Design a protein with these regions (language model features):
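Secretory targeting and sorting signals
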Residues: 1-41
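Serine/threonine-rich, low-complexity linker/repeat segments that form flexible spacers/stalks
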Residues: 2, 6-7, 42-149, 171, ...
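Generic detection of short hydrophobic beta-strand segments and adjacent strand-loop junctions
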Residues: 51, 157, 201-203, 208-213, ...
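Beta-sandwich strand segments
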Residues: 98-102, 121-123, 228-270
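Internal, charge-rich low-complexity segments
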Residues: 128-152, 226-251
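Low-complexity, intrinsically disordered segments enriched in Ser/Thr together with acidic residues
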Residues: 161-218
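Internal, hydrophobic beta-strand segments that form the core of beta-sheet-rich folds
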Residues: 202-242
Length: 305
């Protein structure tokens, strides 16, 4: 079971993802879920591939998936300016059946974003009304450290259901539901019935507020530093737990990193900047001097040359 998915064209979507690595595929839907953004924001969209490793009763299943992440951010900010950027993955899906297994749901979904350099973190929050097809624990954003523990000095922003994930957290499991869940609906993102029985969903956008530093650029990225850049690591930026029925309940904990395939060591563009916010140069104060040449004395009412 858990055979690699086969992509199938559909009228409403550009690509179809299959179980057991459902969260990292790209899906563009015409007119879907336009999100309000701050004035003067520049929209950056980055497409990239991820290599995913899904555990199963037959051993690890490897799959390459397509991804899309959008960032709405100001093109430039002033030194010391408080600003907000918005980041969100595209919609994706999982099938009704795959290789004899009947899917049940996905849960313990997680996306990790790196906190950018050259700015001071202020806050991060889920944007209400930007997710589709989720239930169980409401998505939230936690600042965590490399071990996945909540830490006010951590360098990672974790989108999850209260840190209930499959690994790299104090609240982990690979054989029980938890956190953000995607129940089977067999519906598209717009609520219409999907002809193939696929269940479409979308994780919410996150607004990140920061204060710009003195110089340089600010570049939002997914988490890839250290072990997060390894193939099939619990620290990977995107992880989730698939549940299916095949001779009993089966679980497929899945871990995805931005690389072209399982045999590729270097990370791809997905590990690079998803947007670039320039910090404008501070104005330079130039001292000026005005010299006046006048006679030492003058008669009242007389012109002075």
């Amino acid at each position: 079971m858990f055979a690699l998915p086969k992509e199938v064209p559909m009228p409403q979507i550009s690509q179809l993802r299959r179980f057991a690595v459902p969260i990292t595929g790209t899906a563009m839907v015409a007119g879907m879920l336009l999100i309000g953004t701050p004035a003067s924001a520049a929209i950056s969209t980055t497409g990239f591939k991820t290599a995913c490793v899904a555990g199963s009763i037959i051993g690890d299943v490897h799959k390459v998936t397509d991804n899309l992440i959008t960032v709405d951010a100001p093109a430039s900010v002033q030194p010391g300016e408080t600003f907000t950027y918005r980041i969100q993955p595209s919609g994706t899906s999982y099938p009704d059946k795959d290789s004899g297994a009947t899917t049940t749901n996905l849960s313990r979904l997680k996306v990790d974003y790196a906190i950018p350099a050259n700015a001071t973190f202020v806050s991060a929050a889920v944007v209400a009304g930007t997710s589709v097809g989720l239930d169980s624990v409401a998505p939230n954003v936690l600042r965590v450290n490399d071990s996945g523990n909540v830490d006010g000095s951590g360098g990672i922003l974790r989108l999850s259901g209260n840190n209930q994930v499959i690994g790299n957290s104090p609240t982990t499991s690979t054989n029980s539901e938890g956190g953000i869940r995607v129940p089977k609906s067999k519906k598209n993102l717009d609520g219409s019935t999907n002809g193939n029985g696929d269940t479409w969903f979308r994780l919410p956008a996150v607004d990140v507020t920061m204060v710009a530093g003195a110089t340089g650029v600010i570049q939002p990225k997914v988490r890839t530093a250290g072990t997060a850049g390894n193939l099939g690591a619990s620290e990977n930026f995107s992880t989730q737990l698939a549940k299916a029925s095949f001779l009993g309940t089966q679980w497929a904990p899945t871990r995805c990193s931005p690389r072209e395939n399982k045999d590729t060591t270097p990370l791809n563009a997905g590990a690079g900047p998803l947007a670039t916010i320039s910090i404008a140069s501070a104005p330079v104060d130039v001292e000026t001097t005005t010299s006046l040449s006048v006679p030492a004395t003058a008669i009242t009412g007389s012109a002075v040359d």
